């Protein structure tokens, strides 16, 4: 999808307002004060520097973990948001985590319930939400 309307119409996505910081042949950076992170894409986007833009993330593309990523920098996070698990919805083989970020946003992450004894996050746990560059949707309107 290229618009916020379509992204939300075809499924639930978390959408953040951002601004294009840099665009080069193989890398683009979008900063988002609303999200509290930088979105780094390993591709060129159809935008110019300083352009207002939106980014979207699908819940099933967001990885949730209690472990801090090795390259996590709290002063300049990249493709990662820290938060607290506020709610968990169990739906058969899936769990949807509702994570509140420091900016007050609620981000949903969906995870499979494959292992019963796995160390899944629980209510009030501090967690890190990460995603791969190719899973960032760039929305132009």
Cite the ranges covered by each PLM segment.
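Conserved beta-strand-loop-alpha-helix hinge in the C-terminal portion
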Residues: 1-11
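Non-catalytic connector elements of ABC transporters
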Residues: 13-15, 22-141
């Amino acid at each position: 999808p290229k618009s916020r309307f379509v992204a939300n119409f075809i499924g639930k996505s978390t959408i953040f307002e951002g601004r294009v910081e840099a665009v080069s042949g193989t890398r683009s950076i979008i900063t988002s004060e609303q999200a509290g992170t930088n979105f780094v894409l390993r591709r060129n986007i159809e935008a110019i520097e300083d352009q207002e833009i939106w980014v979207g993330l699908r819940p099933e593309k967001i990885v949730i973990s209690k472990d801090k990523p090795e390259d996590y920098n709290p002063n300049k996070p990249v493709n990662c948001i820290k938060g607290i698990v506020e709610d968990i919805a169990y739906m058969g083989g899936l769990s949807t985590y509702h994570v509140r970020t420091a900016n007050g946003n609620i981000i949903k992450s969906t995870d499979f319930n494959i292992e019963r004894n796995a160390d899944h996050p629980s209510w009030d746990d501090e967690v890190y939400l990460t995603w791969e560059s190719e899973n960032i949707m760039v929305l132009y309107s």
